[in-house]
Amino acid sequence: MLARKVLARQCLVVARLCAGRFASSLCGCSCRGLMRPPKFNSSKSLSRSMTSSSLFESPNCPSCGVVLQTEHPDKDGYCLLPKGERKVKNYQNELKEKLFLNVKREELADRLGHEVDSESLIIPKEMYQKPRTPKRLVCQRCFKSQNYSLIDHSIREENPEHKILDEIPSNANIVHVLSAVDFPLGLSKELVNRFKPTQITYVITKSDVFFPDKLGLQRTGAAYFEDSLVKLVGADPRKVVLVSGKRNWGLKQLLSTLPRGPNYFLGMTNTGKSTLIRSIVGKDYSKKQTENGPGVSHLPSFTRKPMKFKMDNNSLELVDLPGYTAPNGGVYKYLKEENYRDILNVKQLKPLTSLKAYTETLPSKPKLFNGVRVICIGGLVYIRPPKGVVLKQFSLVNLPSFMYSSLKKATSVIQAPPQALVNCSVVKEDSPDELVRYVIPPFYGLIDLVIQGVGFIKLLPTGARNTRELIEIFAPKDIQLMVRDSILKYVYKTHAEHDSTNNLLHKKNIKARGQTILRRLPKKPVFTKLFPVPANVPSHELLTMVTGKDDLAEEDKEYRYDIQYPNRYWDETICK
């Protein structure tokens, strides 16, 4: 009797360890009745063999949206079906035998006599084997890109802005995704002309570049982007949201802002649109992000067809549209393929407190220029300050920066790089053949030179100003550039030019006695296009071409601080 009770307890332990997947009735001993027999319907279990019909419940690639097919490897959407059934080791039976002190099933059956036979001690396969969840089946283009960073050259698809907008219904709700690092160059002008402001929600991604935590994001960063979008396109400030798809910042605020029904996510390629949707979908379903949402990649135009994602409550639907590309490919026309990933890695600014001035974020030493020397930023941009200018510059983009004795020397290194400078450039060797010459209109203080799809470079002239010449910029013709009054003046608290009693301070006393404030966007222009100029015009004549004056010395005396400078020669039409 005692031995039978021991066996009953052992059966109960085995049953509990197997998570209730088999009942005590299987063993037939006196433990019968101690556990409720589980309800099991073998017809509901998933088959281990995966058929093509079950895999193609959704005929589109869940990563890029293209229609899947298995017959033509050289055509678009080709995918490989997974191989056959996988063998599963019977760990539960092994555990049961160990708990019974290695007593074989036949011996155990003899001890229990007529109450049980050896076959009843074998656990049916369906009881311990979990149904296999099909893996995401993706096309070979996505698979190779995400796992091996390989580019399929046979698939080159450009998505102009108007082509993407044509897929959006006229009464739709639109989420316009913009990147903070090249803001506002990704702004769709045609979108604003086609749809009402009430239909558009603006989402600023990659905001974590400026802030170490999401608290600073909302406290000091939101006002700048709200003011800018109101000024440029008449946006509703209540429908401007700052997020970080990588860190899951601002997702709750975004979901509470979006109206019910379908919301079409629109943005330039590689603005973080698909990453944002993956974060939202993954958070909603409480699963890993890799199991939900669209695929992400450093390749341009990775999403190729509209993809719909319904949230759990079924009242909100996210539609991921393909990213629209810059005319003629933009920066990707000139980039080497092995450097596609580099331009997405933006340097993180060191966290600033309210007691630190934004100028402290310029670590480079000032350099004196002679009017001929140039700074080359990865071969994408060449900066030539005028003679006598002392310039501090800091590149927030992950690109190599080199100084050359002249523009001719810099381009010759790009076209035929020596072994020591083979990594000085991220562009193709023929990119200098399409250089266009620009000038920055007169400015005062810290500015950002913004490169579309890449990031920005901070420029700060120090010392006496050159009032007769302008800073010249050279870049390949299809790379879009602009200048903005430095974003750091507005997303961080800075020192004002007056103290707590509103007395105007001398420059040297601003840091010590200036009142700490968060600046709002002024009425003056804070964005401007670069002015293209002929390549053969002497540098000393460029100021006259832009301003109509040959010297700004008298005008310069009127303003003591950069915040007072009116930027009267700036042109904001690039953003309108």
UniProtKB/Swiss-Prot annotation:
Gene3D superfamilies: P-loop containing nucleotide triphosphate hydrolases. May be involved in the mitochondrial lipid metabolism. PANTHER family: GENETIC INTERACTOR OF PROHIBITINS 3, MITOCHONDRIAL (PTHR46434:SF1). The lineage of its organism: Eukaryota, Fungi, Dikarya, Ascomycota, Saccharomycotina. One of its GO terms (cellular component) is mitochondrion. It is found in: Mitochondrion. PROSITE patterns: G_CP. SUPFAM superfamilies: P-loop containing nucleoside triphosphate hydrolases. GO terms for molecular function: GTP binding. This is Genetic interactor of prohibitins 3, mitochondrial. Residues 162-327 form the CP-type G domain. Residues 1-49 form a transit peptide. InterPro entries: G_CP_dom, GTP-bd, Mito_lipid_metab_GTPase, P-loop_NTPase. It comes from Komagataella phaffii (strain GS115 / ATCC 20864) (Yeast). Keywords: Mitochondrion, Transit peptide. Belongs to the TRAFAC class YlqF/YawG GTPase family. GEP3 subfamily.
